[in-house]
Curated annotation (Swiss-Prot):
Organism classification: Bacteria, Bacillati, Actinomycetota, Actinomycetes, Frankiales
UniProt pathway: Amino-acid biosynthesis; L-histidine biosynthesis; L-histidine from 5-phospho-alpha-D-ribose 1-diphosphate: step 7/9
GO terms of molecular function: histidinol-phosphate transaminase activity; pyridoxal phosphate binding
Keyword Transferase among UniProt keywords: yes
UniProt record similarity statement: Belongs to the class-II pyridoxal-phosphate-dependent aminotransferase family. Histidinol-phosphate aminotransferase subfamily.
InterPro entries, per the entry: Aminotrans_II_pyridoxalP_BS (IPR001917), Aminotransferase_I/II_large (IPR004839), HisP_aminotrans (IPR005861), PyrdxlP-dep_Trfase (IPR015424), PyrdxlP-dep_Trfase_major (IPR015421), PyrdxlP-dep_Trfase_small (IPR015422)
Chain ranges passing through the membrane: none
One Gene Ontology term from the biological process aspect of the record: L-histidine biosynthetic process
Identification of the protein by name: Histidinol-phosphate aminotransferase
Cofactor requirements of the protein: pyridoxal 5'-phosphate
Species, as recorded: Frankia casuarinae (strain DSM 45818 / CECT 9043 / HFP020203 / CcI3)
Record flagged with keyword Amino-acid biosynthesis: yes
HAMAP family in the record: HisC_aminotrans_2
Length: 397
């Protein structure tokens, strides 16, 4: 890997090419690839699970006014503990939790990835193990490795489900400092049954060590009747539930993540957070969005409608899919998912190849974007052959 200076005229500057092997990079980081979905300029981008609905003109105006007000004191450091924002988040979480969430139980940071990083800084590190069950959100593994925490990957069943027995057996075997679960799971999209999370909590409580972290980034999109893991917090002090404002709140550009947990967990994060880590502007934007929660969350039902439309139509093309409680659908199985991905891209539709053989993931976009996806996929699969094992092979030219 060769590094070159970036920016205007960089190619004319006398920078000596430098091989990264010459840098004192930690051995545990060598050979790794950075996280990132392709950022391509195509008409239809359905690969990063963004909410396709931009903020309204009224909300844009409100955010602008809040940012302008924050700018009047930009010479001062922000509220170091983001007390007002955390109080607003606690109020927002209370209905899902089924109990009165208190400010002391909530923490906020720059996106849920910083939340995950702080948890690993506080409870992981050298000589400690983090356990996850793959396929799942790849940043759990990457942040674990970045914090010198050993990563152990447990495996899901062939249909991507996870049973209490599998989870408890893995915890007993590896005695992890942190157990990462996704509900809904990314990339498969299905929420975990509460008994799986409860079993994980009981297992770490039995060992006397470890935390259970449930990543609920897509919780607002879950199907009717599916409870949030927040309801388990009063009974399990070692449980942490993380969320984000990037998805349901359509604030991916603001980078706001948060968690709910026992106050002692929040107190622990004060030890690893950077000073004034959440800017005045970020706090102002997030609080404004929460004040307009009804408007923003009104887009959730529209997104779910397009998700459910995809779920209804894909089986008619011979495809299998995982039940979705998120704003995306995981579908397959293909003999060559990369060829399908490329065919869709050639048609101007970008979906996500997460690297799992035979499967792709598509975000539920606007109606016209879903039209484009379904049309392109139908054309791609024209003449394809479904084998006895259910695997789809594209027609040869």
């Amino acid at each position: 890997m060769i590094f070159k200076a970036a920016g205007s005229g960089a190619e004319d500057r006398p920078w000596r090419p430098w091989d990264a092997d010459g840098l004192p990079l930690r051995d545990s980081l060598r050979g790794l690839s950075p996280y990132g979905a392709p950022q391509l300029d195509v008409p239809v981008r359905l690969n990063t699970n963004e909410n396709p609905h931009p903020p309204s003109v009224g909300l844009v105006d409100a955010i602008g006014k809040a940012a302008a007000l924050a700018a009047t004191e930009a010479n001062r450091y922000p509220d170091r503990d983001a007390e007002a924002l955390r109080a607003d988040l606690a109020y927002y979480l209370t209905p899902d939790a089924g109990f009165g969430v208190h400010t002391s139980q909530v923490w906020a940071a720059n996106g849920s990835n910083e939340i995950l990083q702080q948890l690993l800084q506080a409870f992981g590190g050298p000589g400690r193990v983090a356990l996850g069950f793959e396929p799942s959100y790849s940043m759990h593994r990457l942040i674990a490795l970045a914090t010198a925490t050993e990563w152990v990957a447990g495996q899901r069943a062939e249909d991507f489900t996870l049973s209490p027995a599998v989870v408890t057996d893995a915890i007993a075997r590896h005695r992890p400092a942190l157990v990462f679960l996704c509900s809904p799971n990314n990339p498969t999209g299905t929420a975990l049954p509460p008994e799986v999370v409860a079993a994980a909590c009981e297992a770490v409580e039995a060992t006397g060590s470890g935390m259970v972290v449930v990543d609920e980034a897509y919780a607002e999109f879950r199907r009717a009747g599916v409870p949030s893991t927040l309801t388990l917090l009063p009974r399990h002090p070692r449980l942490v539930v993380t969320r984000t404002m990037s998805k349901a709140f359509a604030l991916a550009g603001a980078r706001v993540g948060y968690l709910a947990a026992h106050p002692a967990v929040v107190d622990s994060l004060y030890l690893v957070r950077l000073p004034y880590h959440l800017s005045s502007f970020t706090q102002a934007v997030a609080r404004t969005a929460l004040a307009h929660a009804d408007e923003l969350l009104g887009t959730v039902e529209a997104v779910k409608a397009q998700r459910d439309r995809i779920v209804r139509e894909l089986p008619a093309l011979g495809l299998r899919l995982a039940p979705s409680d998120a704003n995306f659908v995981f579908f397959g199985r293909f003999a060559d998912q990369r060829a399908v991905w490329q065919s869709l891209l050639d048609a101007g539709v970008l979906v996500r190849d997460v690297g799992l053989t035979g499967w792709l993931r598509v975000t539920a976009g606007l109606p016209n974007e879903v039209d484009a996806f379904l049309g392109a996929l139908g054309r791609t699969l024209t003449g394809s052959v479904i084998g006895a094992d259910g695997v789809i092979s594209l027609a040869t030219a």
